[in-house]
Amino acid sequence: MEYTDNPRKILGRVDVIYSDTEISKDIQTTESGNSAISHPDEVFGAYLVPTVKGCTMDGNATMDGSFQMMDDSVVLGWWSGSLSGSSGVFANAPWIEISFVKRPIISWVVLGDEKRNEYPVDFILQYKRDGKIVHSDSVTVNNQIQVRLTPQLEDITSIRLTITKWSKPNACAKILKFYDRMMERYEGDAIEMFEVSEEMGAADGNYNIVSDTMTVNIFNKDRKFDKGYLRSLMILDRKLLPSIGIETDGEVKYQPLGTFYSDEWQINQDSQWVKCSAVDRLMRLQKKTYVGFPLTENASLYDIAADILLNIGETADTFVISNDLKSVIVPMAFLPKGTAWDALQEIANAGLCKVFVNREDKINVRSEKEPKTTTAIRIDKSNMFSYSSSVSLTEFANRISVEYCDVSLSDDTVEAVSVELNIEPNASLELTLDYNTEVAYPAMETDNLNVLLTDFQGGVNACSVVAKNKTAQKQKAVLMVTGKAIEITTKSLTMQDDDSVRNNGVTEYSHPSSDLVQSHAQAEYIARILLERMHAGEGVITTTWRGNPKLNLGEKYESEDRFGDSQELVCEYNKFTFDGGLKQETRGRTI
């Protein structure tokens, strides 16, 4: 069965992850002891296999070439400080305890070292509620690397693992994982409906950053959300993963629709349904501070975008940036301190980019030049409920104005900020200082040689630094940041469609300014693209149809109206509504 079939059987489901290593920032561990190299915080990570087969000097490693030396860069989990005896029994049983906010424990995992084939043989798990043991699980004669226990407990705040016997003699305990996420899947009668909206650009056609949303109504079985085991987890940032599926030859193939984080829970005692509203992770960027991009000559928009994302904790595998932005060079690039959201909006304005999160939960910075995949999806009167075409005032213009700037530096060094500190004996202060003026190439100095300045990161309007008192006496110090003053001269370029102006009069659009547009060529490119897009008659087509979740943002599809006229569109917006069946609203822009 395909999504184009009629009739068809559509299924929907929503996985809600109430606790995992990403969204649970409160997790802590305590241990009886640690080996010289030990990473107890890794036991609640997502690791299933150590980085290396660690070489040890306890007689349990050989020179066969399979063992490797270790350092703190490897993933290995918790290695205890005590060794087992000749029979594997510990004279002093090592333990590790993990604590967290109150949560139910449906299942729990204990994972040893797969590469070394080592694991706990005899061990005890103690489940605690506010420090008091409420349940224990004792395991003996275990011979498995991984053990999953299912205690089914409520309101647990910590769990202790005590190991009395190990699988190898004269060896420390090696626990890679001591954690399990809390996840429930809702499908069938457990879901009344859900709605997912994904968008790569606003309807007005501006280049900007857009956050996706979803809502779901879940059956409050046995009142578990307000009176049962989930009541303590009705908090923000729980992870939701909606999917749409279709049954083919007795097998359901699901299409994930993204990852969202709970923004609001509505639990009405007069209703059997709980409503959850959620947003994608882009919304978090409004609360994340980006220290800024220091003035750098000939930096590309690609490098600046990557710097923003890496500095707020993203990694190279959690975002995608259009490669053509590497060729957009900014002669004197800089960004001031601000939110990561605002910084990415600057990239969008300067490079004509859409910033959004795709269904793989990756942040996309996609330029207008990004190649668009063609699909076989077609919307016509056979699968369409409604069709509308719109060209708003914000989507039509025949004269485009784009600002660009020249950036230069003063010859003189100026003071950006000066601050007086009192630092306690042997203490360190982590400081973030806002400047009084924007400067390039900032440098910091102090009038007190007993104060050590480290980890200085200087931007154009703010900096961060660690100031350490090297003495046993209280110290007073003045910190001063100096640099070259930044001077900006703004220019404007105007481009128009002469024929349209003669026929229709002038309708002008001014593109949002950005200090990252610093060349006439880039301003001309922006104006030309905008003029092409804002021709009369080139608006957006919005259709409501039977739907196919295989249509992704940025992909091309064919749309035919009720009069038989067809055109190729680029998908910029989808809204999926599942209530036992599927309905989809799609907005596409003419190419």
Where are the regions that the model predicts?
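Assembly/oligomerization scaffold segments
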Residues: 1-295, 332-334, 346-352, 413-482, ...
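Solvent-exposed, polar/charged alpha-helical surfaces in well-ordered, non-transmembrane soluble domains
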Residues: 283, 303-307, 341-349
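Soluble non-cytosolic domains of exported or imported proteins
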Residues: 295-303, 334-342
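Extended amphipathic alpha-helical segments with heptad-repeat/coiled-coil character used for oligomerization
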Residues: 349-374
